[in-house]
Each structure stands twice: as C-alpha cells, then as structure tokens.
C-alpha cells in the first residue's frame, strides 16, 4: 500500500480507491452486533495509512471508504477480510479508482 503522507508530512501521489458498500435493512441488527469488530478492523487500516477516511451514509443505506491501494483489485482482496463482508452483511461493494484533483488529498 502507498502511504498517504511521507515522513515529513508532505502530500505524496497515491492511488485512491473509493469503496462503496450498500446494506439491506434486513441486516441492520447483525451489523449492529458486528460493528465493533468492523470498526476495529478499519481502525487498524487507518493506523497503517491504508484507509484515508470512512463513514456511513446518513440514510443508513451503506458507507463510503477511501482507501490508499495499488489498484481496485488490491483493495477488493483486502476488503474480503472485513468482518462485515465475512459475515455476509454487505449487499454490494463497488471499488472504483478515484483521482483527487483538489482538496484534502491533493496539494491544492
């Protein structure tokens, strides 16, 4: 994985993958039960510099996770280890390479 920052805390080029999860209302209770494991897994990836930002959609329909990875397939392989995915709680997962042009993930 490419770290989002160098040791001097300057921005460096990276490949960002936007991971979009969708959830079913039918799995809400199970997600509540597994959520501590899911968030612990994400926290480890944040500490490693792999997950850049994450959070649920306000309507509860899913979540967006921004990931620093070599490519979408690398991210897809990593996310197979997510406790939510392992428990079958993700209806669909979309992995799309995203090119930051301006803002928090760029020099502008």
Residue ranges and their predicted role:
Residues 2-108:
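Conserved, structured core segments of small domains
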